């Protein structure tokens, strides 16, 4: 069996490592560097350049040089409109997905990622002297299902079987905790070029267990570069009355200067930015020359630093720990070299951050360790990761019913039994969701599939078992089975889309912000379900036994049913309105069942069943075991 290499496929830079003699080793590329820029360029001659050589020619070829492709991977075109504004190359729609227009053709984000992976694969093959076909690849902890699948696809394009996708902070913890004998509670604060993650873990004696994770897939070093770039454009416009925003070559030079200034300000109090011949007008060439102090830089980027603190708060809350209980805060990612970030982390957790690991290499090292575990070369190391967002399906009333909660250890498998919402319903539509909001429409749709051939039966009778199976890569498989007929259908959620920045925020952050609204909607949906079920049961009672009941009582019940139906037709009816209609109808239905009981005598059996039926939605929602609930499935023709 060949080596399983470890790759950190980063937004800005990537890195490859292997296990050698029981120890992880970062490999040096052809240029003699331990990291490779995640940049791919296409030349007029038809050549494809990858890494440092591609980055070097970006100023003269900005429209055909692709960087930060990781921000686009696994996402639909409609979701990346903000990102498009930040890059000099052209992003186009390709069906629902996005692609880059380069030299008259298109390249997908997966293809760009594959080009970087292929270069790192060759670095490993050159070092080992043998073919490499398997890898462990890391992704941001907050990558959703589609983005993970797209990353696996990039590996396949590069000729690599991705044996495992693991979260970047988890990989860093694996590298950090590999030799730790004493149990420690640690925070991995991972601030990379394009993404931010924070994970809280327990490490010790070969076990790395994730307690909680959170993050922002659109917060990274790129954002700091953009702040400096926009400041330079504004300053130049003030001095020269020339706007550089539409000059792609100038923008590329400004981007490189901004990145260089950011790096220099990590060790210096001030930096000089000097770009001769940045542009020209009728009076001749124009030069950009200015100075930027660390104090000014900190002031301009203060909001970005603060943005990273909110995921830290949420991860701590989810883990059940206090900041004082954390033993170490390990800094990962190149952006953690920024002094303002180090200070914010120290202030938040109340301790000096741990800088014992190389922030650019530790993730690849952890991936290599996991590769060694999978290959059997590394013993006594156990990795217990989690899924970052809750997973579930849409049920009656447009509610999301969660099957797998966020921060559940993976791999994980969970089944729940649902039923139909209409009589003789022949099929159900399984709507798979990811997110933290109560209502299905506020969460991310991962996919849909149909289970057909359900035998005719009254609503609530068919038993449909839905199973969610999330594998060790964090990729979801969903199946549905009709328990009576044995018919089943399953789906592997594929990379149909990713989440926009707004969607990711809504997934968890907005859940708190809209807590009251979500609560009202969920309560109204519950009351609607109860009333709808009681209407059904009352109509059935009148149909089956109406002849034995007083005409006046039946008339009153029918009027209450009509009133309830009218309220149900009002999609904006409040929970109180629905509850009031339920109580009025329930009182009348109780009278009917009492009359029926008197007429039939105190015989057990049917009378008890009628009484049960008359209890309506609340009774039926809670009877039959906790695993059986009515599901809102529509007939699919």
From Swiss-Prot:
In terms of NCBIfam families, this protein maps to: PRK00290.1 (NF001413), PRK05183.1 (NF003520), prok_dnaK (TIGR02350)
Its job: Acts as a chaperone.
InterPro entries to which the protein is assigned, alphabetical: ATPase_NBD, Chaperone_DnaK, Heat_shock_70_CS, HSP70_C_sf, HSP70_peptide-bd_sf, Hsp_70_fam
**Source organism, top-level taxon:** Bacteria
A GO molecular function term, named singly, is: ATP-dependent protein folding chaperone
| Chain positions with Phosphothreonine modification | 195
User: Which Pfam families does the record cross-reference, listed alphabetically?
Assistant: HSP70 (PF00012)
Protein name, entry field: Chaperone protein DnaK
Chain positions covered by the region annotation Disordered:
596-637
Residues annotated as signal peptide = none
Q: Which family does it belong to?
A: Belongs to the heat shock protein 70 family.
Organism, as annotated: Bdellovibrio bacteriovorus (strain ATCC 15356 / DSM 50701 / NCIMB 9529 / HD100)
Provide the alphabetized UniProt keywords.
ATP-binding, Chaperone, Nucleotide-binding, Phosphoprotein, Stress response
Biased segments, Low complexity type: 600-621
Give the induction annotation: By stress conditions e.g. heat shock.
